[in-house]
Curated annotation (Swiss-Prot):
Alphabetical list of Pfam families matching this protein: Xan_ur_permease (PF00860)
Entry's transmembrane regions: 64-84, 91-111, 113-133, 153-173, 184-204, 220-240, 273-293, 313-333, 334-354, 370-390
Localization of this protein: Membrane
Species name: Arabidopsis thaliana
Protein name (record): Putative nucleobase-ascorbate transporter 9
GO molecular function: transmembrane transporter activity
GO cellular component terms, semicolon-separated: membrane
Length: 419
């Protein structure tokens, strides 16, 4: 009896042990990632600057990145105004100086976030409307037309700047931002990056098609820009682009703009001012989205997210580079000769971080709610659909008058033919 009891106990013990092993092998239920105020992996925060030599290199990277938009906007607008290469150089120097000064003020006295204040694409539409105004068509001299147009743009920007100052100092924008929830911030920040998709790969494909680690992430721009720039210089010097179309030469040649060889009282109109003030609301939302993204990450959008360095010292050094190269135009013109496809390839990387910063706000939302899903889906869909409507409208395939136009479907889209 004793032996039987002992065997039974052993069997029971063995069975019990088997049951415990089965419970240990049971798959654990998946748990959501915990919400963190700051993402891990940041090596230098706002108040922990890197060494001076490293900060100078990182600041120069930010200068190169901001140089892309600083050169692209004058390259689009100055020829429409009647200006040449010399006028384009002056506009680029002015944009660099103002961007550097604004960045310094913002880093010392403003929000003090590691953010570079640069030009915005939102003002291109109202500026273009001023350029094509009928009151400037009577000037036959291109230089005089450029001067008159620039004075009107300056006057509109002065009124718009005063308007933005009043909106911010009176607390109007502070009260508006107070109602922004994580659900409303997510599409705002996301499309701050996605809204600039047209300056990414569409510009990269105009150029020639040609070690993983922490240092490659941090100094990626310093490694890739000189190599690709030298390659573009070799192609330009060897005459590869001499017989290419003009659009290819404009995008790829290092001497395309003549910047290096050409490096020396506003008017006010109520119509221009109102158009510019409408664009200022867009920039207010754009700046708010970037500041939210920067504060959420604990590092700046774009390049700061890639380098994992969110120090104010880096941004202030970058602003110093802007001021220096805007005063000494020959140096600035040298770096401004970087081909646009090189800068566009950088935008393909850094704008991804801007968009992902907006999506990170969704972790604070209840995605199981149908109201949340509808608001999120509606915001994303309309942010894509409305610009597409205006794009088709200005291309002549949008709204049609049925009394005068017969609409036919050709299998690829709407085609409007005269009846």
């Amino acid at each position: 009896m004793a032996n039987g009891a002992g065997n039974g106990g052993g069997g029971a013990g063995g069975n019990g042990g088997g049951g415990n092993n089965g419970a240990g092998n049971r798959a654990e239920e998946l748990q959501p990632h915990p919400v963190k105020e700051q993402l891990p992996g940041i090596q230098y925060c706002v108040n922990s600057p890197p060494p001076w030599l490293e900060a100078v290199v990182l600041g120069f990277q930010h200068y190169l990145l901001s140089l892309g938009i600083t050169v692209l906007i004058p390259s689009l607008l100055v020829p429409l105004m009647g200006g040449g290469d010399a006028e384009k150089v002056k506009v680029i120097q002015t944009l660099l100086f103002v961007s550097g000064l604004t960045t310094l003020f913002q880093s010392f006295f403003g929000t003090r976030l590691p953010v570079i204040a640069s030009a915005s694409y939102a003002y291109i539409i109202p500026i273009t409307s001023i350029i094509y105004s009928t009151r400037f068509t009577y000037y036959t001299d291109p230089f005089e037309r450029f001067v008159r147009t620039m004075r009107s743009i300056q006057g509109a920007l002065i009124i718009t700047g005063c308007f933005q100052v009043l909106v911010c100092f009176l607390g109007v924008w502070r009260n508006i931002v107070r109602f922004l929830s994580p659900l409303s911030i997510a599409p705002l920040v996301t499309f701050t990056g996605l809204g600039l998709y047209h300056i990414g790969f569409p510009l990269v494909k105009k150029g020639p098609m040609i070690w993983d680690g922490n240092r490659c992430d941090r100094y990626g721009m310093m490694l890739c820009i000189p190599v690709v720039w030298l390659f573009a210089q070799l192609l330009t010097s060897s005459g590869v682009y001499d017989h290419k179309p003009q659009t290819t030469q404009t995008s790829c040649r290092t001497d395309r703009t003549g910047l290096i060889t050409n490096t020396p009282c506003p008017t006010f109109d109520i119509t221009d001012s109102f158009a510019m003030m409408a664009a200022s609301f867009v920039t207010l939302f754009e700046s708010t989205g970037l500041f939210y993204a920067s504060a959420r990450y604990g590092k700046n959008v774009g390049l700061l997210a890639m380098t994992k360095v969110g120090s104010r010292r880096v941004i202030q050094i970058s602003a110093a580079f802007m001021l220096f190269f805007s005063i000494f135009g020959k140096f600035g013109a040298f770096f401004a000769s970087i081909p646009l496809p090189i800068m566009a390839s950088l935008y393909c990387i850094v704008l991804c971080f801007v968009s992902s910063a907006g999506l990170s706000f969704l972790q604070f939302c209840n995605l199981n709610s149908f109201n949340t899903k509808f608001i999120l889906g509606f915001s994303f869909f309309m942010a894509i659909s409305i610009p597409q409507y205006f794009r088709e409208y200005y291309n002549g395939v949008g709204r049609c008058d049925k009394s005068d136009i017969h609409v036919t479907y050709n299998g690829c889209g709407n085609n409007c033919d005269s009846a």
